[in-house]
Each structure stands twice: as C-alpha cells, then as structure tokens.
C-alpha cells in the first residue's frame, strides 16, 4: 500500500470517531449559566436570554414563571406544580402532595469532556431536591439544569417506589391555553409551541391534549414503577430568537441528541446482493467491499464509513445467527478487509422479525423455544423479557466480535406509517428505547439507524441517530423518466411525512431511501442514464441527511457515475459543519413544484434546487428567505456552481430568479459578498 493511502486511511479512522458538527445559535450570545438564591425562598436559573424561577415554601417546589429575556415575555405560572400523576384507579395527585425530604441543593454541573452527547461536555448550574409521598410509597429525585450557552432549561424526574406504584399517566407540562400555545406537529412526541418558545416531554411517545383551560404534555405509563425499576423522564422549557423557532429548536436538539449530527456514508447490500428471501455469502460481500475500496476509497479518495449488510446474512431457523453456508466465519473476514481500508461493518436486524417468508420462519423458530420468544400482532416483541435479552445478546456480540459501527433496526412496534405507538405497542417502544440506550452505553459512537416503526418526533434522536421518513422504500411519483419519478417519490414523501407532519424534526436525521442503482426491486426497471443518475446523486447529497445510503451494485457504475458519486459525496463531507441546519425550500415535489434544501452557517451556505416537472420553471431565490436568515445578518451572497467547483459567480445579490429546465438539479455554494 502506498504511503499516501495509508495516511488517508488513518485520517478516515480519526474522522469517523471524532468529527462533530455543531449548529450556531441564531441570536445574541447566550452566556454562562447562573443560579441565584433570591429573598423569599426563590431560586432563579438564567443566562443572557432565558430565566426560570422556582419557589420553595419549605414543603415543596413550584414554578413561578418562565421568561424570554430578549422578547421581554414572561409566562406567569402561578406557582404551578412540577407534575401531576394519574393512577390506575383514576385518582390524581400533584407534586404539591409530596414533601421535601431535605433542603434543596444548588450546585455546578461538571462537564464531561469525553462525552458524545454535546451538552454533556458543557458545565452549568443545577437546582435539585428529593421528595416523598409516604402514603403512596413514592420518592422523587428532581433537578432543573441550565447548561452554559443553552437556550433551554431541562427538568429531570426520577420516580422510585417502595413497593409498586401503578401510575398510568404522567403530566409534566401544563400551560394556559389562552396564551395561544399549540402542538408543534401532527405526531406523538411533538413539542408545544408558544410564539418563539417551546415546551416538551423529551420522549417520542409524549402526547399533547387540550382542555378548556390548559394544553398539557403527558406520557402514558403502562408499566408499574417498582422497587427495582425506577422511572426517569425529562422535560424542556426553551426559547428562540424571534423568527428563528426551527433553528433555535434545532440548536437545542443538536446539543441533547445521543450523538450530534455526523455523516455515515455507507454501502448497503439491499437491492443488490440482498433481496426478498434470498441469502448471500461472504464472497459476494467481499467483492462489494473490494470494488468500493478500489474505485471509491483508493482511486477517488472518498471516506466510506461502513459496509452495511442487510437482510440475507442469517439463518431464518436460528434467529439472528449466521447461515453457515454463506458465512462459516461470520463477518470476521469482512471486518478485516473493511478495517484495512479505513472503513467498518454495519448490519441489519429486525426487532419484529423482518418480512415475508423469512419472518414466518423466524417466528416459527421463536415459538418453539423453551420458553418461547414473545410476540405481538406485528411479530416479535421486545417488551417480552426472553426475546429482549436474546436480541440484546446478539447485538452486543456483533459489537464485541466484529466492532460493528452501525445497526439498521428495521421494524418495531406499530410498523410503517405510524404517527405514534398507541397503547398496543407502547411497551414495545419503551423496550426498544432501552435497547438503544444499552447499546450506546456499550459503544457510545455506535450509529443506530431507526427505521420502520418510527415517526417524526425529534425525541427519537435521544436514543438513535435517525428515523425513517415512512412510505414505501421506493416508489414513483410525478413526471419524467422512471428514475426521475423515483427521486420525486423519495423527496415527496419526506415533504409530506416529515416537513408537514413534524415541522421541528431535523431533516438532517432521516433515512430517506438513499441512492439505488442495483439489480432488484422497482429501481431495476430504471434506465441507468448518466444524467438521471447524476440528478439522483446530487439531489440526495444536497438533502443534507447524515445517513448516506448507497444501495449500489458497483459493477453497474461507469467512470462518469463513479466521478459524480465521488464529487457529490466529498462536497457533502466538505460541508458537514453546515449540513445540520438543512431545511426545506419550495413546494411539494409530487405536485411538480420546484423544491430543494438549504443550510446556513455564519461562514457560508448551500442550496439545492430541483424542478420535478417536464416544463421549464422559474424560482425566486431570496437569500433571506431560503436561508431563513436571522435578523441583522447580511443577505448579499455570491452563488457558485457546486457541481463543477467553478469560481465563476453564477448569481450575486440579495435576490435573483433562476430558470430550471425540466428535471434539472442545481446545487450552489453561497458566500457573503465582500
């Protein structure tokens, strides 16, 4: 191996583990957290933009008010209770019926500089207390945290029972409806929004309901709190600059998600050597690794993070064990070859058992075990302790034996096109979240691709790295060639299922279907036209998603395709620190409206536009609008062609009109004019 390639591989390994992108706060400096003890037994957590006041009457703690210091708006809470518990017998109590065990404590938060969750690397201030309700045999540890440079206060509640507490519902945020507070999305786990403020239970199954007087955020609790099983849940109260709700909320999410935004460029075997119920083998997998190694990693110096092997590696009659004919040594050889070129191995697993005949066989095997693996209407159930521990053991062994860098978890709980778990799959999703936390504790840098069974709640990102956009894996929509219709379908369902249903969900954290150039499924019928493939590649990388899926048979690509793939993926990598801000621009692809993605940072911006129709169309690019610029930010930009990398200025100014030919994809780098 040549020296420069060896150095390049070392660079890849370092970058894979430690690259972190962070979004800029779109307002004035937030500043260090402060905690003040005020006369009258009150405590205030604050910084330059946010302020929250708690009152201690010697028996308990209540919320007095929450303030946006920049907008000069204070929500007076009237000494509101910290929480409300509903029990199985329909009785209701609030935190006012708990008593302080000891005087509350104020303290500094010690930063963990090695944490993968960005907020954990920061210091701050904490106000905490312990409560008890002797009659119920319940204790609570509560804390309110404000980290340095945060635009939000988090409250963490940990309930512990002396024996068993049959709590059925926990209400943690209760706001007066007359202030105009609304639910900020159509799915469970959406935050509540009041002007430029946001409030939420940090859980994908959190729900919002309205009464005559209040809008409340609550979580159903279907599993009793017991002496050996505590319940921890958290809330957030935050604020954003006026006109910057999406970006201000994103700033919070990027700090608190399990891992900040990162790009995971990888080959996926589905549509290629994996398909339906067929099995593949080590030689086929090694061929794909070596082809990508030679054509992309070495020849074109592209960082390929992983090779993920989808359904087809296992023996259906063993449940998540290798088929010995295809993989007599498991993934040992694959891992060795992948790691030698600076990459890694990923693997597909389906919590509920997969699909079609393979699923039937796996479930039949599970039923015949002693004791049998638990199931629900959709397949295996992680809520069952027998199956949970089997699934956990399998995933732990993949990490231990093959240093797996990513899991694709395909199929859990309610399945595809869900907007929440419902009562039927609530326990299954709780178990799934626990599984993700268990795995992240074993390997904090692990990438977890959460697919079928998720919905557009940002709080999935507290546990994994992305969700599925919902809809079909692939389809056709709109006009043009079959591949152009495939692009329109992919992006159209992102628009309908995420942009519209979960407007505060980060578009950077989606599995949207990737690039498919392979042998099986609907994409096999797509003509491999170089122009269409280029449009597919650039529109995909222009979407800014961190999960960069290449469902590609490398033998199908010609030199033009390889060069395009290399240029587009490297362009995305060069803009990794901008991509977290990616947001929607334009209209509905399926209605043949011009659309695209944009992302902004104080240093530079990017813009991708596509015309999904067979007619020439014009689009007005107003920099302030497409980049959603904060107030008092310059909006005079120079636009350059990202595809060619040319230094020729294509457009300049605050606004310009662009003409897009039928099915044209344009990608711009934008720099402030000097």
Show which residues each predicted segment covers:
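Active-site groove signature of glycoside hydrolases
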Residues: 302-313, 392-422
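Bacterial Sec-dependent N-terminal signal peptides
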Residues: 1-26
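Conserved structural scaffold segments of CAZyme catalytic domains across common CAZy folds
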Residues: 105-346, 350-360, 547-590, 599-605, ...
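Aromatic- and acidic-residue-enriched segments that line the glycan-binding/catalytic groove
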Residues: 319-327, 353-375, 462-473
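Active-site-adjacent "subsite" loops/lids of carbohydrate-active enzymes
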Residues: 271, 275-277, 344-402
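Solvent-exposed beta-strand/loop surfaces of large extracellular or lumenal domains
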Residues: 203-213, 633-655
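Active-site-proximal substrate-binding groove within the catalytic cores of carbohydrate-active enzymes
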Residues: 47-48, 66, 228-230, 268, ...
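Acidic-aromatic substrate-binding/catalytic surfaces of carbohydrate-active enzymes
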Residues: 40-130
